[in-house]
A protein has these predicted regions:
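Predominantly extracellular beta-rich ligand-binding scaffolds that present long acidic/polar faces
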Residues: 6, 11-177
Length: 177
């Protein structure tokens, strides 16, 4: 099943995406959870294109399990992430005897990430990374939001996507061609 800019996706977040694609999705929700927690999706196995999250994310640790938290996605397995960004702060509370991976963009990553950006309280964009990625921190000096928008739009155009970012305020927003 694919979510393409639907009301459900814009108002809420995806708990676990097992297949399909999420495209043209945004979330400003404050998200709290206990296992895999992210601004748009807690766990993602399908593709994600042209999505962003601006709300804060909190991983509430109270488990011996392996846990992950990220500004966009907590656990990123499966298919690709293309032209997405996250700006909400990512924090954690508690402790675990398992592995805990937290990143400003993704908690755990096992797939290709292209032309993606983050700007929040984390220097590290990906908590645990098992792939070559293009996830870059917007620092306002060398990497600005305008440079990020240009790179994300180039990647979207190359992929044949009808989505584009615009920078008319402090943060980029999406529009469909």
């Amino acid at each position: 099943r694919s979510l393409v800019g639907s009301e459900m996706c814009i108002r809420d977040r995806v708990g676990a995406q097992k297949a399909g694609s999420i495209t043209g999705c945004s979330s400003s929700a404050t998200v709290k959870g206990t296992v895999d927690v992210g601004g748009v999706a807690g766990e993602k196995w399908g593709s994600m294109t042209a999505c962003y999250a601006t709300g804060n994310v909190t991983l509430e640790i109270d488990s011996p399990k392996n846990l992950s938290g990220g500004g966009l996605v907590g656990f990123n397995g499966g298919s690709s992430v293309l032209a997405c960004y996250a700006t909400g702060n990512v924090t954690s509370t508690g402790s675990s005897t398992g592995n805990v991976h937290i990143g400003g963009f993704l908690g755990d990553n096992y797939t290709t990430v292209t032309a993606c950006y983050w700007k929040n309280n984390h220097e590290q964009g990906i908590g645990y990374n098992n792939k070559v990625t293009e996830a870059t921190k917007v620092d306002g000096t060398d990497v600005t939001w305008q440079k990020a928008v240009d790179a994300m739009n180039t990647a979207l155009q190359t992929a044949g996507s009808k989505w584009r970012y615009e920078l008319n305020g402090a943060l980029p927003t999406l529009r469909k061609l």
